[in-house]
Structures are given as structure tokens and as C-alpha cells.
């Protein structure tokens, strides 16, 4: 969250499933409101429907905040990385979802090497350009009511399942 709050020019997060905590989501909104270019590179193909739909339940809010969403089309995405201003990066096994962060006890490294961060940012930009489809606010707004309802129900189910664990208060 500190890296997102310190961002000045660009934030790029890449992961299959994006179900962030309210704190992370609000930090992304604050960054976008400051004029930071915030981009998400997310799974385009459905591997696990519940997580995929729950991630998509946030698209309306994210797009409305000016956050760009790119869905990876080349195959299943297993990257879990992020770069802030080419000076801070995270790399590891955790998606930004409650199961990765709380239940599965996955972890990410924090890297502050400018060369590494710049290279990672360039690689992500290449993937976005070559292997992704950008989701636009206008295209998303035209999705059917059933489409949107399925995503909202999936998100609520994820958080309901989380509430059955001892980790609910931590997310």
C-alpha cells in the first residue's frame, strides 16, 4: 500500500486473480486520482470461474476510476508481479486475493533494484501490447444484466467463504 501511495507516474500489476482488500483497492483509486497511470494485466481466459468472475465484479469501479484493464489472451497467466514507477517491484506466488494472501500463506518479494524494475516494466508493457485485449468502460457497460449479476454473486460468495475462516477480519 505504501508503494501505491508513493506512486508518481505508473503502477502495473499482473496476476490471474485480482480480488484486492479494500485498502489496496482504495490505494489504487487514490493513485489514479493523482494522475498515476494504473494498469492491471489480468487473466483473460477462464481457468477458475468463481475467482475469474469475482475479479471481473470490480471492473466497473476500476474503469470508472480511470484504471486500465488488460486481459491476457495468449494462454493461462500465472504471473504475480507488480511494478511502481520502475523503482519498486513485487514478484512471487500470491495473487491479490484473500486466499493467496491469508489462507494459502503465499508470499511475494519486494525488489528495489532500478534495472530489474525497469526491465520488468518493459516486459509487462510488451505483454500488454502483444498478448492482451483492453477492456474499455463502454464495452463493459454493454454487458448483460445476467453477466454482471454472475460476477457480483461470485464476489459475494468469495467473501462469504472467507467469512467462514478465521482470516475474515484480516482482509
Sequence positions of predicted segments:
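PLD/PLD-like phosphodiesterase catalytic module centered on the HKD motif
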Residues: 7-13, 17-171
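Structural alpha-helical scaffold elements that stabilize or flank donor/cofactor-binding regions
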Residues: 3-5
Amino acid at each position: 500500500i505504501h508503494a501505491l501511495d508513493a506512486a508518481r507516474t505508473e503502477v502495473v500489476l499482473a496476476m490471474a486473480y485480482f480480488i484486492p482488500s479494500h485498502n489496496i483497492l482504495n490505494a489504487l483509486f487514490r493513485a489514479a486520482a493523482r494522475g498515476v497511470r494504473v494498469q492491471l494485466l489480468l487473466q483473460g481466459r477462464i481457468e477458475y470461474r468463481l475467482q475469474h468472475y469475482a475479479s471481473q465484479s470490480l471492473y466497473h469501479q476500476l474503469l470508472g476510476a480511470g484504471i486500465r484493464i488488460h486481459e491476457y489472451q495468449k494462454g493461462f497467466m500465472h504471473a504475480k508481479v507488480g511494478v511502481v514507477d520502475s523503482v519498486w517491484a513485487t514478484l512471487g506466488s500470491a495473487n491479490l486475493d484473500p486466499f493467496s494472501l491469508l489462507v494459502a500463506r503465499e508470499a511475494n518479494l519486494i525488489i528495489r533494484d532500478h534495472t530489474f524494475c525497469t526491465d520488468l516494466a518493459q516486459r509487462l508493457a510488451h505483454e500488454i501490447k502483444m498478448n492482451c485485449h483492453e477492456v474499455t468502460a463502454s464495452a463493459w457497460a454493454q454487458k448483460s444484466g445476467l453477466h454482471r449479476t454472475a460476477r457480483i454473486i461470485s464476489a459475494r460468495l468469495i467473501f462469504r467463504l472467507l467469512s467462514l475462516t478465521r482470516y475474515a477480519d484480516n482482509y
